[in-house]
Amino acid sequence: HLKASVRHLQLLTPLFRHNWIRFPKSSFVFIIANISGKMGIMKNELVKIARKTLPQGALEKTENAYRVARTKMISLRYGNPARGLRIIAVTGTNGKTTTACYINEILKEAGFKTALFTTAVIEIAGKEKINDLNATVPTVARLFSFFQTAQREGVEYVILEATSHALSQHKFDGVPIEAAVMTNLTQDHLDYHKTMEAYAAAKAKLLEKKPKYIVLNRDDEWFEYFDKFTASGEKMTYGTNPEAEAHLTHVKLYKKGTEASLLIDHQTHLELATNLPGEFNVMNMSAAVSLAYLLGIKLEDIQEGVANLEAIPGRFERVDNKLGIDIIVDYAHTPDALEKLLKTTHKITKGRLTLVFGACGDRDKTKRPIMGELAANLADRIFLTDEESYNENPDEIRAMIRQGIERTKKAHKMTEIADRKQAIYQALKSAVRGDTILITGMGHEQYRIVNGKRIPWNDKKVVQEIISEIEKKSRKISL
């Protein structure tokens, strides 16, 4: 049955990426990309057949062996380009991109040539572009091509994000990690990992490599779990907890920035000013500063590097306007990120706080009602809308979020508009001076996937178009 199914599958090879390994007696082992829809159903059926046909655990063992071998072979193909690079990997549920960007700015200020690969931006030797791959970690081939280009450009430090998916899929096997930063662990990706324990174990694969330096969040709920891993060199913790080696002693929030004080090793006082607002960004900054301190970067370079980071696409990104309202686009798509974002924004908002949000399809469904509940409790107004439905029914996604909103008995705050552009338009149109509008979930992304189709889309650009329309109408009225 398995052989027959594989023969049928071979006819469909142009439709999706797959890899074949042939073994004796004409059996096959195959790895199929993460797909959904009709192709996803076929994939699931084939996996069921394989589980019945092969010995228990053989499918998972063979898949892991294949992924390990694939990474090694591709590394060889590109001439083992990661060797000779000083690679810093940032992992965690939230804050990876911002932390990586802070590290990048500090190292550049210290005179190092760097390369950066994050969900939002890619940069090699000062040449930056938006990451439009819709992937935090690219394919293995693209990753090693990135390393190769960095090496050719004379880069010394590479800073990148290491996701739980990439670590589980052995994308970093054989990559020499000099430093690992763990930002936090909160609910996300349970569609893939199933449990928080499995999610934590996937993140811990980075620490199992025994990098020279490890930086951990002392305030994080999962700190004790990750603290059991040792570094081959030094480990540093950061946070508001007095036991943290980099102790955050003072934070002052402003509308367009933050000031903070760090006490490192009970002796070094460091005063920092950043353009990024919010306590959550101060934590990201503290992680970056802790690593820079371990690397021996001068304190003045750390301070200047932190101050150099102006903004990150789709990360608390303000959209300029003449309407007298604050419009912020942010990537927040987990309960923890949304909660912290709403709490921070409330502190710097004079008027009402309006949230425009939805949830991504084909992802962890359990977080949807949780995010709905958070929105109802922390926002003054809610515009519930669609995000990227992938192959799910968007009505069902919104219904799950709505359950959380209705649980709070605050459904009167909510206006449901499926069309995302219309939801943003109505939020902007109904705002008054002093209000803040948060548009979350998509951040920097350049397209949406709806019903399996890739549609060009960017929240910031859509907001700018709507602002232009509103401003034109107001000018006509004044005439």
Where would I find each of the regions flagged by the language model?
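N-terminal leader/targeting and accessory segments in enzymes
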Residues: 1, 10-12, 20-22, 26-89, ...
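ATP-dependent carboxylate-amine ligase
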Residues: 34-47, 51-64, 234, 267, ...
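Phosphate-binding loop of NTP-binding sites
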Residues: 45-218, 222-233, 286, 292-295, ...
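Acidic, Mg2+-coordinating active-site environments of NTP-dependent enzymes
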Residues: 83-85, 153, 177-327, 403-415, ...
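Short acidic, glycine/proline-rich loop/turn micro-motifs
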Residues: 126-131, 274, 448-452
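Glycine/Thr-rich phosphate-binding loops of Rossmann-like dinucleotide-binding domains
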Residues: 168-169, 190-191, 223-225, 245, ...
